[in-house]
């Protein structure tokens, strides 16, 4: 029997230590120990091994956080970064290249505007804005080089709402990634992937 996302999130927990803690502790460590130098060498040499080597790459506390959020968002997997803005910037830089075009809602967080208008142009990535109250105009902005459509819904701070299924239809028609900042709604209220989003971004300083 399949479990609801909420049940999966509750059941996901890092392997208990010999201290038999009830909740996952904070693993405040940069590195990890090994039984031998040979074991350490294998861990560093083989990326396929499911073992912690350095907290910048993986950490039990962070791993559980990722798994729980992914379960709540009905997502395949996730990545945790230091801040919400670093998550947004990392997403842009992962999926966009020189010459690409991104369509974005104009009603977005101020720092995201800064990335779109000041940083991405340095790498030859251009953007177009659309009005969330006039979604019928979005498709006219699509170009051959358009690779992504980005939106916050509800937007920060204006709480503008848009139909994600409508956006998903446009993106699938033109083979564009639909990226949704869901930090104001959280997966408790809205799960964008269920409505066709490809990627979901969060800031953990809002309601999570």
Residue ranges and their predicted role:
Residues 1-2, 50-53, 60, 74-75, ...:
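N-terminal start-of-chain detector that recognizes signal peptides
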Residues 1-59, 67:
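N-terminal "arm"/small-domain region of PLP-dependent enzymes with the aminotransferase-like
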Residues 21-22, 74, 89, 123:
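Short, basic and Ser/Thr-rich N-terminal targeting/leader segments
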Residues 9-14, 79-208:
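Conserved PLP-enzyme active-site core in the AAT-like
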Residues 3, 21, 58-62, 109, ...:
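Generic structural signal for well-ordered, non-membrane alpha-helical segments
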Residues 1-2, 20, 46, 72, ...:
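A generic structural signal for short, solvent-exposed coil/turn residues
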Residues 36-86, 111-118:
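Conserved N-terminal alpha-helix of the aminotransferase class I/II PLP-enzyme fold
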């Amino acid at each position: 029997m399949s479990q609801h996302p909420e049940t999966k999130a509750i059941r996901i927990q890092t392997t208990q230590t010999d201290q038999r803690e009830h909740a996952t502790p904070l693993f405040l460590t940069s590195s990890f120990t090994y039984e031998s130098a040979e074991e350490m060498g294998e861990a560093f040499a083989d990326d396929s091994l499911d073992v912690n080597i350095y907290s910048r790459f993986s950490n039990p506390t962070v791993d559980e956080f990722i798994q729980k959020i992914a379960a709540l968002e009905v997502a395949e997997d996730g990545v945790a970064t230091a801040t919400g803005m670093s998550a947004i910037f990392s997403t842009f830089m992962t999926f966009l290249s020189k010459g690409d075009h991104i369509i974005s809602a104009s009603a977005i967080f101020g720092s995201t505007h800064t990335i779109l208008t000041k940083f991405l142009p340095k790498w030859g990535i251009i953007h177009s804005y659309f009005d969330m109250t006039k979604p019928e105009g979005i498709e006219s902005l699509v170009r051959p080089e358009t690779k992504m459509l980005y939106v916050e819904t509800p937007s920060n701070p204006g709480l503008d709402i848009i139909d994600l299924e409508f956006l998903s239809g446009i993106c699938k028609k033109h083979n564009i990634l639909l990226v949704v900042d869901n930090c104001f709604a959280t997966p408790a209220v809205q799960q964008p992937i269920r409505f066709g989003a490809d990627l979901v971004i969060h800031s953990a300083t809002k309601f999570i």
